[in-house]
């Protein structure tokens, strides 16, 4: 039994009410958690793929049957609109069905050999104990993207959720147990960054992390001390390019969705909108009209709801003040709906103009309901501006000339790019991740997600020996 000496209480960003109080796993307790996971790994790793898949499929079925209840938990915990919360549960369900089907798929291959009588087999094998360290902005999808392939590959897994999403993580763990995941194979530990650091230092074989670049850099450095495999998905300052032949109305809708849904708390939000000179004024006029009518507040059906906590509101407002201090114009937009509680962690949406794209304020990553507008003249200028950022997670290009859009896409430094779409919207069968400071070459989700959570074993058989 792991001793826990303190507790963590989370308050809803909607109204300041208590969501849940959970026990905190202290750094000194982490080695015992890892040891129990390692013990459980011994039997779980030799369970058949089909059996593991059947359990994960059951998890998906339970998530699906309880989707409305779970969506209300997400809304209470993070402040998200109810529809968005339901959509996230659906994404977790689909990830479960995708990964569970891998139990009936080929998990290796045969290679030809130059030596007569030799057969070479390449197969996947589990790594051991996986530490899953996730952020708050999409709790159930984050858990599903990491836990399902980690478990399907035969690993034991320890989830360290954000302090902002303790209830959803606790319920997710309970559902896995209900579905038949053996004791110790999947555990949830609550705590601060010190708890996460202790997990890495305890010698886990894999660390899967979603969060900011500065923290991700520390995670990779700490993991390297034990040569632990890392799956890293970090931040973004994602560009959405609008060419002069784009459908402006549709492009405006894409910007509203990409920049302001989830209150801009996506690593894939469109925080830089790069518009061609010839249509800039017309585009901005349409965008302002659309932005003025988008709803914000704490009602369940608004587009822009709360940020996750008051510190996030302060950081967002501080960024806007910094942008104004260097000459930017900040227009506050949106239609407030209802009468939010004084404790609500709300920030009015904003549209920013007048920044240099290569300035600190022009390139910075921020979490909040805002976007920055920039102008370009030639396509090569748009490409250069888009690639100015140190990040390279997602991007979007809007043009009615698909060949032109494809030429731009070929030169963009990003891991996920949409033509005539938003900067977000990855599907579960698509690998998701970035380049430059947005990742390290690993990918979450996708049909090959199990590869990220396993290693390769090569076996040769010599016949006739």
Question: What spans do the regions from the language model cover?
Answer:
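N-terminal Rossmann-like NAD(P)+-binding subdomain of aldehyde/semialdehyde dehydrogenases
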Residues: 1-118
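Short loop/turn microsegments at loop-to-beta-strand junctions
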Residues: 5-8, 270, 393
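Residue-level signal for inorganic ion chemistry
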Residues: 16, 52, 74, 96, ...
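Conserved C-terminal structural/oligomerization subdomain of aldehyde/semialdehyde dehydrogenase
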Residues: 17-21, 339, 346-465
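Short, well-ordered beta-strand elements within core beta-sheets of diverse protein domains
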Residues: 19-25, 40-46, 132, 240-243, ...
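Structural signal for hydrophobic packing residues in well-ordered secondary-structure cores
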Residues: 41, 45, 60-67, 71, ...
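Rossmann-like NAD(P) dinucleotide-binding subdomain of oxidoreductase/dehydrogenase enzymes
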Residues: 109-250, 376
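ALDH superfamily catalytic-core signature
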Residues: 206, 214-356, 419
């Amino acid at each position: 039994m792991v001793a826990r000496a303190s507790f963590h209480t989370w308050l809803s960003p909607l109204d300041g009410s208590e969501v849940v109080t959970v026990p905190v796993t202290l750094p000194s307790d982490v080695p015992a958690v890892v040891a129990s996971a390692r013990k459980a790994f011994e039997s779980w790793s030799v369970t058949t793929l089909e059996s593991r898949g059947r359990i994960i499929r059951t998890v998906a079925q339970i998530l699906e049957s309880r989707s409305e209840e779970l969506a209300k938990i997400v809304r209470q915990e993070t402040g998200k609109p109810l529809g968005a919360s339901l959509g996230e549960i659906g994404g977790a369900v689909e990830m479960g069905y995708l990964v569970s089907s891998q139990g009936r798929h080929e998990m290796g291959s045969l290679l030809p050999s130059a030596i007569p009588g030799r057969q070479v087999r390449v197969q996947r094998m589990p790594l051991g104990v996986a530490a899953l360290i996730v952020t708050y902005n999409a709790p159930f999808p984050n858990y599903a993207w990491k836990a399902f392939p980690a478990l399907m590959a035969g690993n034991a897994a320890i989830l360290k959720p954000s302090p902002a999403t303790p209830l959803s993580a606790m319920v997710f763990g309970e559902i896995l147990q209900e579905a038949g995941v053996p004791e110790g194979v999947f555990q949830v530990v609550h705590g601060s960054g010190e708890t996460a650091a202790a997990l890495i230092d305890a010698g886990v074989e894999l660390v899967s992390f979603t969060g900011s670049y500065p923290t991700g850099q520390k995670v990779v450095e700490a993991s390297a001390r034990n040569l632990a495999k890392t799956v890293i998905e970090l931040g973004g300052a994602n560009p959405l390019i609008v060419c002069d032949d784009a459908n402006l109305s549709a492009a405006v809708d894409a910007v509203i969705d990409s920049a302001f849904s989830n209150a801009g708390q996506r690593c894939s939000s469109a925080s830089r909108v790069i518009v061609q000179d010839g249509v800039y004024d017309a585009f901005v006029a349409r965008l302002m009209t659309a932005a003025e009518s988008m709803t914000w507040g704490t009602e369940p059906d608004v587009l822009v709801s709360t940020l996750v906590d008051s510190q996030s509101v302060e950081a967002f407002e501080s960024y806007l003040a910094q942008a104004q201090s260097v000459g930017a114009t900040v227009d506050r937009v949106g239609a407030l709906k209802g009468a939010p509680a004084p404790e609500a962690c709300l920030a009015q949406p904003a549209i920013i103009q007048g920044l240099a794209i290569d300035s600190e304020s022009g390139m910075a990553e921020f979490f909040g309901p805002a976007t920055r507008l920039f102008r370009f003249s030639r396509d090569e200028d748009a490409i250069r501006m888009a690639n100015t950022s140190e990040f390279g997670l997602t991007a979007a290009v809007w043009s009615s000339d698909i060949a032109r859009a494809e030429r731009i896409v070929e030169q963009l430094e990003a891991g996920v790019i949409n033509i005539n779409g938003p900067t977000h919207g990855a599907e579960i069968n698509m690998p998701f991740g970035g380049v430059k400071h947005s990742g390290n070459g690993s990918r979450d989700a996708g049909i090959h997600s199990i590869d990220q959570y396993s290693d390769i074993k090569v076996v040769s058989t010599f016949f006739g020996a």
